[in-house]
């Protein structure tokens, strides 16, 4: 299988490895961000999915273009299907998740906490009697601390964010306003494609002037949960998990076999890997309304990325 499992390019400066992305800080204040095919969930890498990195980059490109009038973003250029050149930002230490439904499988999801009996969370209150995957009265923000050291994200309330001096009140007000506006616009566009944008994660940073800017990715199958709109009502009535366009079913496969936060995760079978690859491709086409064009250059993905990034090598 043609996969980009890593993108270590020695000629590029200031390398930093993220969960699924390789980063290189350039002298001009920009950053090279390469999306690999690594699939991350439960704070670990589960496997690699063919074309996943290209889907993420191109889906984010579509959404950054759709939302540039709502919130400034980090995009400078796209030299390769898997690569974005972005402004280098000081990433804010709060991860912002916006949720429109009582859903999720992670330890910080409102459904997980709700099933544990919690009703007060993230500075809000939920009533008794709600069902799995039920729509919320209105979208809510569920912020968590950003685990820069590889630890687990921890739930936060808006007041805790300010009290702990993670953000100023003004920063939180701006960030939350952006997040809700981005989410509502995303839901509107997704609905036109027959999809429900269930929840999503945003990452923000500040530039040299302190301006808050959207970073990382937006409304991709990795950062978001999508359901098929035409089957949601029936699935909800029958208590079934809605048909999804994201990595949620891989999470579900793992969750049925172990506690991924405590146990060793079993190897993901090849048929599930290929199925997941097709899900990512289908998601791109359904979300954007555009046909996915895989690379057919004959090169390995790493060789192609390297060639397209040669203009950024020092001294070139």
From Swiss-Prot:
Superkingdom assignment: Bacteria
CDD domains cross-referenced by the UniProt entry: SAICAR_synt_Sc
GO molecular function: ATP binding; phosphoribosylaminoimidazolesuccinocarboxamide synthase activity
InterPro entries: SAICAR_synt/ADE2_N (IPR028923), SAICAR_synthetase_CS (IPR018236)
Primary enzyme class: ligase
Keywords (A to Z) from UniProt: ATP-binding, Ligase, Nucleotide-binding, Purine biosynthesis
The protein's annotated pathway: Purine metabolism; IMP biosynthesis via de novo pathway; 5-amino-1-(5-phospho-D-ribosyl)imidazole-4-carboxamide from 5-amino-1-(5-phospho-D-ribosyl)imidazole-4-carboxylate: step 1/2
Pfam families referenced in this protein's UniProt entry, alphabetically: SAICAR_synt (PF01259)
GO BP annotations listed: 'de novo' IMP biosynthetic process
HAMAP family: SAICAR_synth (MF_00137)
Family: Belongs to the SAICAR synthetase family.
Protein name: Putative phosphoribosylaminoimidazole-succinocarboxamide synthase 2
Lineage of the species this protein comes from: Bacteria, Pseudomonadati, Pseudomonadota, Alphaproteobacteria, Hyphomicrobiales
Gene name per UniProt: purC2
């Amino acid at each position: 299988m043609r996969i980009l499992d890593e993108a270590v390019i020695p000629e590029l400066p200031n390398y930093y490895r993220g969960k699924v992305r390789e980063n290189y800080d350039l002298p001009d204040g920009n950053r090279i961000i390469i999306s690999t095919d690594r699939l991350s969930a439960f704070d670990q890498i589960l496997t690699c999915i063919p074309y996943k990195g290209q889907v993420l980059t191109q889906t984010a490109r579509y959404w950054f273009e759709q939302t540039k009038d709502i919130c400034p973003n980090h995009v400078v250029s796209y030299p390769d299907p898997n690569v974005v050149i972005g402004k280098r930002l000081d990433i804010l230490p709060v991860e912002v998740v916006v949720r429109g439904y009582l859903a999720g499988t992670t330890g910080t999801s409102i459904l997980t906490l709700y099933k544990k009996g919690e009703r007060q969370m993230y500075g809000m209150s939920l009533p008794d009697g709600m069902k799995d995957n039920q729509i919320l009265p209105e979208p809510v923000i569920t912020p968590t601390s950003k685990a820069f050291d590889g630890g687990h994200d921890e739930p936060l309330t808006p007041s805790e964010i300010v009290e702990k001096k993670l953000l100023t009140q003004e920063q939180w007000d701006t960030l939350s306003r952006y997040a809700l506006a981005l989410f509502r616009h995303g839901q509107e566009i997704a609905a036109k494609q027959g999809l429900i944008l269930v929840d999503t994660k945003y990452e923000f940073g500040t530039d040299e002037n302190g301006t808050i800017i959207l970073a990382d990715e937006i409304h991709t199958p990795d950062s978001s949960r999508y359901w098929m709109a035409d089957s949601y009502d029936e699935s909800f009535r029958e208590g079934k998990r809605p048909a999804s366009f994201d990595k949620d079913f891989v999470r579900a496969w793992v969750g049925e076999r172990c506690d991924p936060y405590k146990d060793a995760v079993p190897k993901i079978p090849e048929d599930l890997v290929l199925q997941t690859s097709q899900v990512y491709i289908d998601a791109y086409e359904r979300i954007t309304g555009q046909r996915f064009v895989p690379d057919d250059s004959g090169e390995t993905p790493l060789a192609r990325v390297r060639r397209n990034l040669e203009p950024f090598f020092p001294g070139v």
